[in-house]
Each structure stands twice: as C-alpha cells, then as structure tokens.
C-alpha cells in the first residue's frame, strides 16, 4: 500500500541561519527569494525565521518571512534544494544567550 504524503502544518515555523549579506539584501528589497537546502518539508504559508550570523555567531538580528511561492522539482534545482519566494518580511531583534563552555 502506498503511504499517504504527509504535508507539514500550514502554520509551521522554522528557524534557519543566514549570513549578514543575505539579510541585508532582503531588508533592502533586492531579494524576494531564497535557494535553500530542504532541511524541512516547507510549504506555502510556513514562516521562516532567518537568524543573522556573523563569523558563526548569532547577532540577535532576525528576519521573519512567510513562504508565498515554492518549488523543489524544477529542472535547474539540485535534488534536496528548493526555491522559496516571499512577498514581505519583518525585522526583529532577539536576546542572545552567551554560552560559556
């Protein structure tokens, strides 16, 4: 028996790391899409929280986007990757917990 395909919840929220230059392109308006590794089964309506990292460390800056368009099966996309389109974003600042090892 074939297994039914399980879609993620439409209101799912995922956190991903992002570099400073990527977040700058988003907030300045020059980028409205992302090419990403499919770490989760994203779908339209999901929220991505992009956490800015500089030299491997979180800066506390985040950008929230809601997926408006998405494809992972187009001819030019590597297996395991997807293109995500979004219309708007929200910028926020969050506290960073400094872990002392």
Question: Which sequence ranges carry the predicted segments?
Answer:
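Catalytic phosphate/metal-binding cores of nucleic-acid and nucleotide-processing enzymes, i.e., regions
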Residues: 10-93
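Short intrinsically disordered terminal tails
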Residues: 3-9, 88-101
